[in-house]
UniProtKB/Swiss-Prot annotation:
It is an enzyme of class 5 (isomerase). The lineage of its organism: Bacteria, Pseudomonadati, Pseudomonadota, Gammaproteobacteria, Enterobacterales. It comes from Klebsiella pneumoniae. The gene is mhbI. Keywords: Isomerase. It catalyses: 3-maleylpyruvate = 3-fumarylpyruvate. It comes from the Bacteria. Its EC number is 5.2.1.4. This is Maleylpyruvate isomerase. GO terms for molecular function: maleylpyruvate isomerase activity.
Length: 11
């Protein structure tokens, strides 16, 4: 999941 990974990294 691209979006999931994106937000996860920013979290």
């Amino acid at each position: 999941m691209k979006l999931y990974s994106f937000f996860n990294x920013r979290a």
